[in-house]
Amino acid sequence: MAFSVVILAAGKGTRMKSSMPKVLHPIGAKPMVQRIIDTVHQLGAASINLVYGHQAEQLQQALGHNALNWCLQAEQLGTGHAVQQAVPHISDDEDVLILVGDAPLIKANTLHNLLQVKNNADVALLTVNVADPTGMGRIIRQGDNVTAIVEHKDASDAQRQICEINTGMMVLNGKDLKRWLANLNSNNAQGEFYLTDVIEMAANEGKVIKAAQPNSEIEVEGINNRKQLAAIERAFQFEQAQELMMQGVSLLDPHRFDLRGDIIVGQDISIDVNVVIEGTVKIGSNVTIGPNCILKDCEIADGATIEANSMLDQAIVGENCSVGPYARLRPGAVMHENARVGNFVEMKKTTLGKGSKANHLTYLGDTTVGIGANIGAGTITCNYDGVNKSKTIIGDGAFIGSNSALVAPVQIGNMATVGAGSVVTKTVADQELAIARAKQRNVSGWQRPTKPE
């Protein structure tokens, strides 16, 4: 049967102590509610209804690219009242999957199983057994059938001993749901309209109510404060790490690895501790990544090595290249095979040719370096005059001496040499030597200044 989805995301989230809506706080660098939306898309829902109540502008800015029905809950009168706001978008002849917006680790296969259970029942609930159910709604059963969900504050002492709890997620027929919602009342300790009361209504009508459970309790754990946010983040990251290891990636410590985007991997990759992956990163085979590296929207080819404490952003690293330690490749940095960038080298909009190297203490911006060139320590390409950026071209086999400044626009020819300490402002032809520095003068008999006694 066709189904639509209602995501409850109207809570104030006061315990987060944040000006940002709770459901926009990130898990793996993505808003938690976006993760739920992405999961729902895998199931083929006919429509997604988002019930919101606070900071609408922030929510729409973050989630506006999704095809959503926006359902405003102006007053926070309970979960039943929240679902009522989506009623105009619910059809009688479809099932309705109700989800909570603060449980981002829910899996598509768990929701698929829940929908399958609904095919053989009138109502399907997602429940879970926990060691400490304090504060949670208890599942009341008669045999295999669920007869009610009792909120903790309304539960008797005997009911509070039950460890099977409500997750807030369920599937109901649209026509039945609308009828039950219309009959809700707020005669309870909280003075709210409980969505859970529809379960008792269904039971009183003799409806068949079945339950499904997730593979892991973490799938349905909600987030109400920063401590829980951090715990869910770590659980998510460890889950990603386990998946990568099953794909053949060696993680020296899977508890100290962060994937905040997507990664495409080859074989025999070794990743040290505290590596962060952001955006979309593609890593070839036989790649080694040292500790404390940040890789964002990069491509790293087979056999490359990224040494410790290096940062790569929108960079392309060719086969058997070496980067770092302490290197920074900014957007537009391209290294061809067997090139090397060493410690404290920064590249931006720069191509480093096959076998070329800049081993230390260098800035290369808006630069093209040919094949087999050597860039000495302390070399700077002066690419910005305060208004415009200009290019530097360094030819094949060129040798740039240490502590040189190449003032763009400038071109260094093939096999040309620049003497150490030079400030080069004009073209250096192929195989020429350029020396652009003050002539050394030695003063004999010179006396150092001394401090007065």
Curated annotation (Swiss-Prot):
Cofactor: Mg(2+)
GO CC term, one of those recorded: membrane
Subcellular location, principal: cytoplasm
Region Pyrophosphorylase: start-end pairs: 1-226
Annotated segments matching region N-acetyltransferase: 248-453
Active site: H360 (proton acceptor)
Highest taxon, organism lineage: Bacteria
Entries under Pfam families matching the protein: Hexapep_2, NTP_transf_3
Co-factor binding comment: Binds 1 Mg(2+) ion per subunit.
Region called Linker, residue ranges: 227-247
Complex formation: Homotrimer.
Family matches, as HAMAP family: GlmU
Family: In the N-terminal section; belongs to the N-acetylglucosamine-1-phosphate uridyltransferase family. In the C-terminal section; belongs to the transferase hexapeptide repeat family.
Protein's name according to its UniProt entry: Bifunctional protein GlmU
Organism: Pseudoalteromonas atlantica (strain T6c / ATCC BAA-1087)
